[in-house]
Amino acid sequence: IITVHAEACTHLDRTIEKIKESGVLASVALNPATDLSCLDYILPKLDMVLLMTVNPGYGGQKYIPYLTDKIRDLRQIVEKRNLKTDIEVDGGVTLNNVRGILDAGANIIVAGSAVFHGDVRSNVEEFLKVM
């Protein structure tokens, strides 16, 4: 899968087409303040949407709470349009918020700092219990 940031791509539709023509799964990442409307016409072409729940740049940032609504909104759009698009969330995912993130509609999570700071095995086991 190749993920491109919507904000960094001048010709998003063409980029997605080129990725798909290569036989690769295509995904678009959205920064926290980017509106879901930028996906209106390309969503059916996407295999996944990555919602950044922190501002990109460095690890260990806190999850931005209002983005749970954005996850929920995207899940509703995907279901309303009868699509199979995965929703990935990256940024500030912890044991304290992962259940709410999944309940809102994400089905793929990135939990970097929450897993790799401390005992990795124990952290993974704790995530699996919550999930």
Model-assigned labels for residue ranges:
Residues E7-C9, A29-A33, V54, D90-N96, ...:
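Active-site beta-loop-alpha junctions enriched in small/polar residues
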Residues V49, L74, D90, I101, ...:
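Conserved, mostly hydrophobic/aromatic
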Residues I1-V28:
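Glycine/small-residue-rich loop that forms an oxyanion/phosphate-binding "nest" at active or ligand-binding sites
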Residues I2-V4, A26-L30, V49-L51, T85-G91, ...:
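Hydrophobic faces of well-ordered beta-strands that scaffold small-molecule active sites
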Residues T34-L46, G91-I109:
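Catalytic cores of alpha/beta
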Residues I16-G23, K70-R81, E125-M131:
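Surface-exposed amphipathic alpha-helices with a cationic face
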Residues P32, I42-R72, Q76, K80-D86, ...:
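Glycine/Thr-rich beta-alpha phosphate-binding loop at enzyme active sites
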Residues V4-T10, L50-Q61, A104-V124:
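Glycine-rich phosphate-binding active-site loops on the catalytic face of alpha/beta enzymes
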